[in-house]
Amino acid sequence: MVSFFKTPIFILIIFLYLNEKVICSINENQNENDTISQNVNQHENINQNVNDNDNIEQLKSMIGNDELHKNLTILEKLILESLEKDKLKYPLLKQGTEQLIDISKFNKKNITDADDETYIIPTVQSTFHDIVKYEHLIKEQSIEIYNSDISDKIKKKIFIVRTLKTIKLMLIPLNSYKQNNDLKSALEELNNVFTNKEAQEESSPIGDHGTFFRKLLTHVRTIKENEDIENKGETLILGDNKIDVMNSNDFFFTTNSNVKFMENLDDITNQYGLGLINHLGPHLIALGHFTVLKLALKNYKNYFEAKSIKFFSWQKILEFSMSDRFKVLDMMCDHESVYYSEKKRRKTYLKVDRSNTSMECNILEYLLHYFNKYQLEIIKTTQDTDFDLHGMMEHKYIKDYFFSFMCNDPKECIIYHTNQFKKEANEENTFPEQEEPNRQISAFNLYLNYYYFMKRYSSYGVKKTLYVHLLNLTGLLNYDTRAYVTSLYLPGYYNAVEMSFTEEKEFSKLFESLIQCIEKCHSDQARQISKDSNLLNNITKCDLCKGAFLYANMKFDEVPSMLQKFYVYLTKGLKIQKVSSLIKTLDIYQDYSNYLSHDINWYTFLFLFRLTSFKEIAKKNVAEAMYLNIKDEDTFNKTVVTNYWYPSPIKKYYTLYVRKHIPNNLVDELEKLMKSGTLEKMKKSLTFLVHVNSFLQLDFFHQLNEPPLGLPRSYPLSLVLEHKFKEWMNSSPAGFYFSNYQNPYIRKDLHDKVLSQKFEPPKMNQWNKVLKSLIECAYDMYFEQRHVKNLYKYHNIYNINNKLMLMRDSIDLYKNNFDDVLFFADIFNMRKYMTATPVYKKVKDRVYHTLHSITGNSVNFYKYGIIYGFKVNKEILKEVVDELYSIYNFNTDIFTDTSFLQTVYLLFRRIEETYRTQRRDDKISVNNVFFMNVANNYSKLNKEEREIEIHNSMASRYYAKTMFAAFQMLFSTMLSNNVDNLDKAYGLSENIQVATSTSAFLTFAYVYNGSIMDSVTNSLLPPYAKKPITQLKYGKTFVFSNYFMLASKMYDMLNYKNLSLLCEYQAVASANFYSAKKVGQFLGRKFLPITTYFLVMRISWTHAFTTGQHLISAFGSPSSTANGKSNASGYKSPESFFFTHGLAAEASKYLFFYFFTNLYLDAYKSFPGGFGPAIKEQTQHVQEQTYERKPSVHSFNRNFFMELVNGFMYAFCFFAISQMYAYFENINFYITSNFRFLDRYYGVFNKYFINYAIIKLKEITSDLLIKYEREAYLSMKKYGYLGEVIAARLSPKDKIMNYVHETNEDIMSNLRRYDMENAFKNKMSTYVDDFAFFDDCGKNEQFLNERCDYCPVIEEVEETQLFTTTGDKNTNKTTEIKKQTSTYIDTEKMNEADSADSDDEKDSDTPDDELMISRFH
């Protein structure tokens, strides 16, 4: 131990030692850091070298790639061979052809041996310029010989010649690098192709460009200022010439048969630096490839000498994910801001100044954006097939999924040989059947893919065309060079330009944007145009706008220009004004059915027109204008049809007004626009299954049904179904919502489940199985009636009553199509349709309905409705809606969205009238009133004929309403541009819980995203569909839930999976909320006079608190008023506006009653079935002598009025002590609750703030007592239960002992246990035992766990006697006992033997005893 005096010396030594260690440690760390920094610098140098080399390697992969060169050469030879063998022997060698092209580089072939006509085909020696001229010749002669029979052949030839021209251009730098091994010289040689020195000496076809555009702008200004010209946009395009609809040849080709004009177009585009676009077209792969090469040449020093900027090949860029492609582009274009995937590219791009971005980067931005969109569109379209992909999957998994689906294995196979590909049999199969697809040859084999393209592509249907493009896409995404080369001839990469026309603007408006761009350029600068498309030249936006204008407007010999042809085709041929209307009907991966495919220059025209027709193109660069243009895609297209917040009364009356004023011939025009077989498809879209009369027998006529013997008369089926929904709603706040729906009694055990940590997920999507058991039970009880049983079971069904046969057919159809059946309803108002009803009764009913509705709503006005079941044939319905939707898009100048919907409804009414062959003309006919309008010999028909009779009978009255409801759901969804975003929103992890929430309607996400409940009632369904879900007392919630299920099916048809699940899961919760809301709203508005009276009183008191004088003297107290003058000093108390101390004592009385009513209303928190039913559980063994109480529905019952009293007590308590809070609730009553939009958001606010405060108040008041009651109840129940079990188990043993003691006391102590039981063998004991188990039993207490419900005792026998026959009755004389068998019986095995009976009871979906009556079998 260190002494006190030595302590300072010891501390000094310790300090010096630590100091030395610290210094050494610092030195060591410094040395380590130096070493690390050296290593880091070394690694950075290595990485720098790698990055430097990587730039060069990326360029080499484009112009020094042996594999790419090899594949391009192979495809070139395949194309040359196919041109030689092509059935279309063109172009012919005519007089003057040799002056156009160098014949020495072409092969000449005779068409036939006997014919002197010769056609020419290119060779390997043909250059790029030779193929350009060859393409001109083909187009010239194709226009001359065109007819519909050779249309596909022309398209195919034009595609492969354009592909050959692209290959020739791609091979130029590849061949150069192969010869010279110099990257820059290879790029320069490519550049030489577009450097045309001879063009400088030639005169331009439009003369001086500056003068031309000056005159153009003057002409435009004159037209705009001329008030006499009505359609200025059309005049700008067509001029003074009124062009009528032209021949198909003029539509299909951009130019007429004039090679000189084609060359002029090439020269114009070259002069403005657009040569690449002109020769390649908007092919996403080819144009991107050469744009990257152009960028490499322009920035060669930065990319490959200074190496300060990263460089990537186009093929490598496409290999990245959709978000990373933009990161790479930013790195290549040396942008300061790099894109991150957390935000949309549009938002991040527009935040940074991009005004100095080169045109090449702008075009690459456009190409990447629409390649991503193309990729998503292809993947989205797979949802129509049997396998699903999603856009965020890794590329490897997309490939694996695709081949797993096509080949049943992730390994590659030739998809054309698979059974999956052959399902769409629109082609002749020349290959033998194979059990296993060929995996030795790659799926991306150039020869096979090109062979199938040339041989069969034109005959492919939608799915096969999709598979071909998806195969190529998987190769591109996984950096397969063969797929990169194969993409050059696929039409989908040209058609992608169509996706960019999304705005709902007229074509002439888009053209005005191009004119504005030219005006801006002309006023800002007078720039001399370049004379070629030199890749080193900087192309400006002005070059692009002017070049695009000249390309689209050039013409010769008064032949219409491309722009004029396209405009006439839209406005007069198709009779539409918007390009987007045309594009929406075209598929991006489609085959030769697209008319644009006759001439690829149509795609070039659309591409150049698209780049220069964005709204902000005059002020922004191309990419900025593009992103600003698609900004509108994020906004909701709000119309009367799609806007779910639109006031429903206004919407209803507007809809009826439009229907009433639709021209009579508009329906006829719609029929003419449809295909010939569409009307038959409309008839097949729905199949009615459950007949109205069948449901009415169990509902409206339930009192006429004979009750089963010993049981009460059954309640109406719609009442039972409605009660079930309300019961689910009442159980949901306690956490018992849909938990184990098969057994409603399971909620008694849920507290024990929580303690045992056993989780049972709610089965929310199987709620209809419970309803199925209720419906089947009701039908079974009907068939158990004595007279029905005698007719149906014990007599020949040949002479059976039509009504009984209809009942049996309806339930059979329902059972067989249970998963697809939907139930709709209509109002059942007999007096309205019966001519014998006196007029005064009709007037009386109308007045009563008005009085019932005017101060609230029409909730529960009718008890019963007309309920029927049907199923939707989704495939046929989808085809019908697609056709009608395309008709609408093509004819927006004729139809608005509302008028088109009502025209379709009138068309459905016409179809409905074709079913009315059996209906009587008089309205009073019972057949018409109760829909028994089936054939008189209905019961004698066979099953198929009876099903047709049911369908025709129901369709004669309800086809139009039912079909139109399904159609409007699909049409309004397709019309809205918000559904895509909404589906994505509900796919997010934070919103998935909203779909499964039992109170989703009170969550902000549910309301903010559009409240699917309001979407169903006010957007997806027509106005008449709201009647049954409001006015029916029995069945309204059941019907509304079926509306949700129909919406789920419709969303699923449109591949909105998340919205489909949302509707499916909310079919019960939201439907219940709507019904309860309507009932509360109905009664709440009845208190308008009372609420107004108290509001006036409150205003007067507020005036008194602030000024000291009442605004209305009548509300002042008599003691404070003298001679009609108020005493100001007695009232003035401004702080009372927030809290009134004087009324606190009075309010406490109401607080007590509020507390008391909470005990009753909140009992479910601890007692799932309520406190009363919980007490009854103790007496379940006692048979009740009374019938069950009538099931409750969403109406004015005991609980409702108790809640009303609770609300009054709450108001009298808190409104009195705080006027500020009272005014807040008054605002809600008068304003918020009367506007649906405000009411939904207020509900969310009320849940998170006001209700939260109420819940906290309850936690310290009523909830404490309820919890205490629960604990006391469980304690008493457990004590009594244990006592009963112990007594029940001891009772049989006591009886045995008593019996033996009474019969033979002398031998009682000598008897063994089985002797006692043998003595008691003729007795049996039965007791109630719920299989409780006693823990920690001692040896003397083990008998407590020995239990049996029914224990018969068998006399002991010898083991040898077990095999004796029953006739050996004297064997008991044997005295020798070898081994005795046990006299105890294994009751569990006995129960297993009787499992056939017990299993039926265990597995049956027995419904609640408050609702159901046991079946009789």
From Swiss-Prot:
* Signal peptide as annotated in the record: 1-24
Q: What GO molecular function terms would the record report?
A: cell adhesion molecule binding
**Membrane-spanning segments:** 1204-1224
The answer to whether keyword Ubl conjugation applies is no
Q: Where is the composition biased (Acidic residues)?
A: 1394-1411
Q: Which InterPro entries match?
A: CLAG (IPR005553)
What gene is this protein a product of? CLAG3.1
- Species name: Plasmodium falciparum (isolate 3D7)
Topology with regard to the membrane?
Single-pass membrane protein; Peripheral membrane protein
Q: What is this protein called?
A: Cytoadherence-linked asexual protein 3.1
